[in-house]
Regions:
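Bacterial Sec-dependent N-terminal signal peptides
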Residues: 1-22
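A short beta-strand-turn-helix
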Residues: 25-42, 72
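Conserved redox-active cysteine motifs that mediate thiol-disulfide chemistry
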Residues: 47-63
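Non-catalytic, surface beta->alpha helical segment in thiol-disulfide oxidoreductase systems
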Residues: 98-138
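Oxidative protein folding and maturation machinery
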Residues: 141-148
Length: 148
């Protein structure tokens, strides 16, 4: 009985912590675009590597926060691109990633809507993500405004 109770408590704790953080789907970029289109969301990409200290810091201190997780999980299909794996290498080349961590908010057609290089404090990261969703403050909108 003790073991069963401990297992249940452990499982509940794990689930509550997991639900609070950014939920990264194990999808290819193309699959993420398809899901984003179907769900009316943008694609959030965390370009990372297992050996990258600032990347791990962002994962542990920012992307694990409840407020960040709730916002990102509601607005985005979230995936990670490991620069040491084939798809990550291709992504890095296609989107001109020259440092990590780098974060992208992409439209369903692959257009960069918003981009962030480097680690940030949680409140700064969340403000960046909110600007990326906002039509008139996204990098995409501002670049188009300059071109007109």
């Amino acid at each position: 009985m003790k073991k069963s109770m401990l297992l249940v408590i452990s499982l509940l704790t794990y689930c509550s912590v997991f639900a609070q953080s950014v939920k990264f789907d194990t999808l290819s970029l193309d699959q993420a675009f398809e899901r984003a289109k179907a769900e009316g969301k943008f694609v959030f990409v965390d370009v990372t590597a297992s050996w990258c200290g600032p990347c791990q810091l962002m994962l542990e201190e920012v992307l694990s926060r409840k407020d960040v997780g709730e916002f990102c999980n509601k607005q985005f299909i979230c995936i990670q691109m490991d620069v040491d794996k084939l798809e990550g290498k291709d992504f890095k080349k296609k989107y001109g990633v020259n440092s990590i961590p780098t974060f992208f908010i992409l439209q369903e057609d692959g257009t960069v809507r918003h981009r962030l290089r480097g680690a940030r404090r949680p409140e700064d990261f969340l403000a960046w993500a909110k600007r990326g969703v906002n039509e008139t403050s996204s990098l995409f909108f501002l670049n188009n405004l300059l071109e007109e």
